[in-house]
Regions:
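P-loop/Walker A phosphate-binding loop and immediately adjacent motor/lid segment at beta-alpha junctions
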Residues: 47-50, 91-124
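Short, function-defining helix-loop hinge/capping sites that tune catalysis or transport
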Residues: 35-39, 128, 178
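A structural motif corresponding to the C-terminal end of an alpha-helix
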Residues: 20-23, 52-57, 77, 104-114, ...
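Chitinase-like catalytic core of GlcNAc-active glycosidases
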Residues: 1-97
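Short flexible/disordered coil segments
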Residues: 49, 56-59, 86-90, 117-128, ...
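Glycan-binding loop/region signatures in secreted carbohydrate-active enzymes
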Residues: 112-173
Length: 182
């Protein structure tokens, strides 16, 4: 999406796929923009996508607390923004980090009416090696012993995750902040 021709071609191809398959929308999940140029290109791609799709389709983007700085115009162009408040680092899982990440997005200018807070249903290794495992695996192996549990040893590695109480608390926080959803 680094040039106008590529953005136009990409948006037109997406529209063809939506029409052909009778889909109602698209979510762009271009993660890990790092430079101002990458943010600018992503923002321009978002604007081009909305221009080509018009208002007929639901159009959202997925952002992450370490890479969320799309332009104000791009924010305005989407129907909602999924905000991935988790991983790949274990430091992203605690409630305090989740709350500060939400506040950071709101302070940046993402309207609460467009912000959908994401929570994980997987765990990451506590040692920072970034191995992941589905929460279902922990349940299936009988490792979940209660709703307050947020850590488990699985196949020799210690994983952190959001247990039931954390998911409940994060959902309550999103509701209290009047976000679009979870």
């Amino acid at each position: 999406v680094a040039d106008e021709a590529a953005r136009v071609a990409f948006a037109k191809n997406i529209k063809k796929i939506l029409e052909k398959n009778k889909l109602d929308g698209i979510d762009l999940d271009f993660e890990w923009a790092e430079t101002e140029k990458e943010y600018e290109d992503y923002s321009l791609a978002i604007l081009k996508m909305r221009e080509v799709l018009g208002d007929k389709y639901v159009f959202s983007v997925s952002l992450h607390p370490v890479c969320y700085k799309i332009s104000k115009e791009a924010i305005a162009a989407v129907d909602f923004i999924s905000y991935q408040c988790y991983g790949p680092s274990p430091v992203r899982f605690p409630m305090e980090k989740y709350c500060s990440d939400i506040q950071m997005a709101l302070a940046y200018g993402i309207p609460k009416e467009k912000l959908v807070a994401g929570v994980p249903f997987y765990g990451v290794t506590k040692d920072g090696s970034k191995k992941t495992e589905a929460y279902f695996s922990f349940v299936q192996d009988g490792l979940i012993t209660g709703p307050a549990q947020n850590e488990v040893t699985y196949k020799g590695d210690v994983y952190v995750f959001d247990g039931q109480n954390n998911i409940r608390a994060k959902t309550r926080y999103a509701m209290d902040q009047q976000l679009k959803g979870m």
